Amino acid sequence: MPFLMIRNDITKVAADAIVNPANRNLLQGSGTSRAIYQAAGEQELTASCEAIGRCDLGRAVCTPAFALPAKYIFHAVCPAWHGGGFGEAEQLAGAYHSALELAAEYHCESVAFPLLSSGNYGYPKEQAFRIAVDTITQYVMEHDLTVYLVLYDRGSLAVSRKLFASVEEYIDDHYVAQNDESYGFGRRRRELSERRRLLEEDAAVLMLGAVPAPAAAPRTARSLESLMDNLGESFTTRLLRLIDERGLKDSTVYKQSNISRQHFSKIQCNRDYNPKKKTVLAFAVGLHLSEDETIDLLKSAGYAFSDGSKRDWIVRYCLEHKIYNINQVNTLLFEYDQEQLGA
């Protein structure tokens, strides 16, 4: 854990290992493969692959990364698309899993994948994306590994049209309306309404006669110690209480929240831990909180939902519609170019 989608050139990703979509003969291909060879150094990488020879379909082998910012290149032999009836899904999942196993074997903390088989291999992008997400998610739930899925465009995403349309409508109803407020339209209406209310009150006072207000009671300054005694639960205290109340294992929660074990340990050991907002929202999804419960959790960390934040409205939509799969939430956020939840 965690698993994140990024939009980047895979040859520039500073992970411990990057994955090359390879053929059985480990020869340089086109597209992503060619870009990796050129960035790593064609002669060195070609010689290294020739020394290995061949690799079976659905498996992966390792070479040095040479001039790339990564340490290793995992060459995953991907299937071409032949209609889906020739074991392509199992072979593609196997290629991902084999590369992930290499990451563990070479003690990598991070690995970056392109969307395997989706280019010149002809695999339908939505199906390729779903296999990538499912295979990677299953693996990182059991291993401490950060995995990046590097995507060039939104066309790879498996967001159903119905869900996307529903989110789009929700954002239009809330986020766009709030932006109207920021341009002054809503504020102007409220000012006019408030002015009318004050005029009506003034007229009432003139008719009834002004009544002097009672003297205000003197305010007693509260000591700093008193204020500290009345602090609410800290974020850490509230988070651990929510986990206990639900009878969940810590590991279940941080994995469902796209949080690494190391990150959770830091939170757990520090009562005054100050999380990032995306971390709080990730735990809200991982704990399957309601919107009201999420508001309380945010408050414990010094945050609140922002009406001017598209990310916040997307998360609120997911909470309202009980979408608690962190990868589905992050896919929607990625679709709208918003920061994803988790580490």
Tell me the role of every PLM-derived stretch:
Residues M1-A103:
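Glycine-/small-residue-enriched capping loops at alpha/beta junctions
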Residues I243, Y254, A284:
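The alpha-helix within a helix-turn-helix
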Residues N258-P275, K299-G302:
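Recognition helix of helix-turn-helix/homeodomain-like DNA-binding domains
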